């Protein structure tokens, strides 16, 4: 425990405590920095409805807040109807979002300074094609074949939001900033007192995305920092590398340039550390911890993490949030794929001089397949098919032009194929294409009050080309003598693209 506290103090002593230049007057918070740190223009906050607000507007809103004594009203009367005197009631949901987004920009300044202050020799060249989500899968394919066990971790989130404020106290010495943060959290917890705490957190996350991301990343960064400490204490092997997973390809070359960094404040998705026996990858609200060794070792790590969350973050997490599985006998959900490392039998013919014999061996293979049930569920929710996968028309789109209908269906189909091109089994993808193509035909037939067969005959090959994916275009150029769809389903090669930087592209087009 003494080592743990000493390690913690050493980490905190490195923090550059940044007294925020907020208090220009007794009660006015204003921005003193351009967020880009390169100019003097006021910071602009982009809201969800694409309106921009400058720091001057935020300053005026805070003055009005104090003039109307809203601090007392919000605590004493949290359930008053905000729609009754809307013009005089300042702290509406709209203004609350402006202030919280502005506050999030200000508290991110020290962490932006920390990134800018990194030595030039440690900088990593950033290339757009190296940020692809797909580039993590070749890394897993290369490393996971030699590991035994995998822990699938759902990173718990503290129910009490005061814990997040306490974590920031180590990094932020500006007391009024912390009071303002508590005010935001208090306001939403009071206003949502009639619902559960988890729903309150969800509402706060939805309405204050930037501030919530900052709080969540602060918590995750603290958790991963001490996870690194546990890793160092549990093994006599030196840590090979750790760092922000900025680029996710050419791993062996990049390992030489990585220094120890503490991520999370620029909305980065992935972070990792690795050594010959252990690999850690975090994505969204989950993490994967894979390693060699015995099952008992994995249970010790599970116990470490549960006790760590309980005694350091002061909240109890359920043991079922950490699943320990043997890689050879299980699959795991990762970035929209069901991945596994099965042992496949391989028959090898060996010949020595005049004698030949067969060797039956087993080889591990990193397998990625498409979760068919999940994707059909998305299509069903978007009313492209029934729950069992039977295509139906989309009545809400019948008012659009024929070209717009074809373009929307074709774009959804191409997005699904593009993201799941790394699947080792293409049959599910062609089933999804069939559902979307027939749903499109039924939508057009419904619009023109015709039958599906008649409309298909009228459009001909132009209708099929709209659903012709980029992957199939590549194969059609390679196999020019084949017919248009003769190669469909005949190849099982996985294709990983280097231009996919968001997993949300899978679901967003359906909504």
Swiss-Prot record:
InterPro entries hit by this protein: Domain_X, Maturase_MatK, Maturase_MatK_N
One GO cellular component term noted in the UniProt record for this chain: chloroplast
Subcellular location: Plastid, Chloroplast
This protein's UniProt keywords: Chloroplast, mRNA processing, Plastid, RNA-binding, tRNA processing
Keyword check for Mitochondrion: no
An MF annotation (GO) of this entry: RNA binding
Source taxon at top rank: Eukaryota
General function of this protein: Usually encoded in the trnK tRNA gene intron. Probably assists in splicing its own and other chloroplast group II introns.
Name used for this protein in its record: Maturase K
Organism field: Hordeum lechleri (Wild barley)
GN (gene name): matK
């Amino acid at each position: 425990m003494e080592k743990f506290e000493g390690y913690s103090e050493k980490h905190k002593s490195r923090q550059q405590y940044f007294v925020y230049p907020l208090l220009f007057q007794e009660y006015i918070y204003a921005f003193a920095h351009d967020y880009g740190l390169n100019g003097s223009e006021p910071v602009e906050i982009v809201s969800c409805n694409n309106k921009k607000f400058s720091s001057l507007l935020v300053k005026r809103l805070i003055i009005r807040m104090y003039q109307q004594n809203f601090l007392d009203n919000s605590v004493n009367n949290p359930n008053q109807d905000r729609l009754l005197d809307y013009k005089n009631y300042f702290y509406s949901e709209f203004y609350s979002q402006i202030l919280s987004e502005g506050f999030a920009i200000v508290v991110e300044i020290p962490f932006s300074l920390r990134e800018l202050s990194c030595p030039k020799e440690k900088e990593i060249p950033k290339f757009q094609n190296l940020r692809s989500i797909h580039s993590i899968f070749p890394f897993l394919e290369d490393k996971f074949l030699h590991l035994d066990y995998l822990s699938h971790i759902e990173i718990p989130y503290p129910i009490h939001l005061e814990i997040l404020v306490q974590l920031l106290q180590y990094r932020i010495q500006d007391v009024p900033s912390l009071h303002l943060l508590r005010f935001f959290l208090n306001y939403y917890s009071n206003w949502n007192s009639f619902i559960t705490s988890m729903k309150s957190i969800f509402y706060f996350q939805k309405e204050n995305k930037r501030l919530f991301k900052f709080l969540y990343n602060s918590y995750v960064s603290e958790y991963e920092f001490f996870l690194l400490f546990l890793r160092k204490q549990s093994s006599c092997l030196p840590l090979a590398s750790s760092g922000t997973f900025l680029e996710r390809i050419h791993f062996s070359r990049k390992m030489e340039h990585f220094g120890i960094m503490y991520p999370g404040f620029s909305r980065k998705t992935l972070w990792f550390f690795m050594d010959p026996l252990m690999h850690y990858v975090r994505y969204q609200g989950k993490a994967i911890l894979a390693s060699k060794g015995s099952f008992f070792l994995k249970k010790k790590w599970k116990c470490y993490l549960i006790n760590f969350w309980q005694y350091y973050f002061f909240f109890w997490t359920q043991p079922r949030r950490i699943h320990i599985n043997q890689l050879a006998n299980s699959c795991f959900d990762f970035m929209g794929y069901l991945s596994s490392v099965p042992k496949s039998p391989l028959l090898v013919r060996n010949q020595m001089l005049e004698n030949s014999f067969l060797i039956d061996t087993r080889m591990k293979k990193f397998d990625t397949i498409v979760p068919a049930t999940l994707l059909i569920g998305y299509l069903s929710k978007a009313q492209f098919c029934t729950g069992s996968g039977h295509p139906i028309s989309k009545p809400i789109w019948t008012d659009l032009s024929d070209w717009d209908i074809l373009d929307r269906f074709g774009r959804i189909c191409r997005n699904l194929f593009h993201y799941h091109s790394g699947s080792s089994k293409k049959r599910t993808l062609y089933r999804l294409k069939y559902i979307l193509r027939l749903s499109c035909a039924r939508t057009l037939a419904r619009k023109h009050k015709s039958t599906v067969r008649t409309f298909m005959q009228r459009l001909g090959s132009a209708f099929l080309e709209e659903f012709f994916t980029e992957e199939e275009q590549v194969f059609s150029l390679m196999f020019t003598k084949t017919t248009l769809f003769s190669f469909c389903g005949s190849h099982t090669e996985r294709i990983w693209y280097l231009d996919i930087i968001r997993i949300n592209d899978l679901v967003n087009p359906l909504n």
